[in-house]
Amino acid sequence: MKNIQGAVFDLYGTLYDVNSVAQVCEEVYSGHGDSISRLWRQKQLEYTWLRSLMGRYVNFEKATEDALRFTCTHLGLSLDDETHQRLSDAYLHLTPYADTADALRRLKAAGLPVGIISNGSHCSIEQVVTNSEMNWAFDQLISVEDVQVFKPDSRVYSLAEKRMGFPKENILFVSSNAWDASAASNFGFPVCWINRQNGAFDELDAKPTHVVRNLAEMSNWLVNSLD
């Protein structure tokens, strides 16, 4: 991968653990933390896909809040305004994966420009990064807000070329979400899929360039391939 001049990362589920919200959910709804977290994330993604198809964009915070309301209604849990705000705020305080910081340090030390490209709004991306004290790691924070549509629309991925300043074939796209990795590959990025769960890749006719188990493996492979 000697032609790689920059790398862009998905945020939710790739650099940051979306299931870290389960702890807050458990504090509020004892015995339901994991089920809330899983269904909430599922509906959050579904709402972004459906809104893109319907042409009814809202920012990621609104999609996340709506998904939470559905989740609590579906599970028969009451949701007052204070609890709704507390749980929604948990998405602004996500926990980075244990290997996130070290992996990004390796890329920065190698002189590689690094960005985030996310469904999150500009505000939410900045808050997640700031709250985890990771501002040092990123040269660009790229939001779908600029095109008013969510991944996997190709207009989102085209933002990386504009903001990173390199053609797509020179930008490594990194995601743990198979659907996202497939769409990025279809767009024309070289893609590294972080397969943490040892799962099967989606059958969408567009495959990743490289598959690893975690971010540590990704950084080792990428830095060594740049030499």
Curated annotation (Swiss-Prot):
Its EC number is 3.8.1.2. This is (S)-2-haloacid dehalogenase. An (S)-2-haloacid binds at L11, Y12, R41, S118, N119. InterPro entries: 2-HAD, HAD-like_sf, HAD-SF_hydro_IA, HAD_sf, PGP-like_dom2, S-2-haloacid_dehalogenase. (S)-2-haloacid dehalogenases may be used for the biodegradation of halogenated substances and their derivatives which are widely used as pesticides, herbicides and other industrial products. Residues 175-180 are annotated as: Important for catalytic activity. The gene is dhl VII. Pfam families: Hydrolase. Gene3D superfamilies: HAD superfamily/HAD-like, Putative phosphatase, domain 2. It catalyses: an (S)-2-haloacid + H2O = a (2R)-2-hydroxycarboxylate + a halide anion + H(+); (S)-2-chloropropanoate + H2O = (R)-lactate + chloride + H(+). The keyword Transport does not apply. GO terms for molecular function: (S)-2-haloacid dehalogenase activity. The active site is at D10. Belongs to the HAD-like hydrolase superfamily. S-2-haloalkanoic acid dehalogenase family. The record marks T14, K151, Y157 as: Important for catalytic activity. Catalyzes the hydrolytic dehalogenation of small (S)-2-haloalkanoic acids to yield the corresponding (R)-2-hydroxyalkanoic acids. Active with 2-halogenated carboxylic acids and converts only the S-isomer (or L-isomer) of 2-chloropropionic acid with inversion of configuration to produce R-lactate (or D-isomer). Keywords: Hydrolase. It is an enzyme of class 3 (hydrolase).
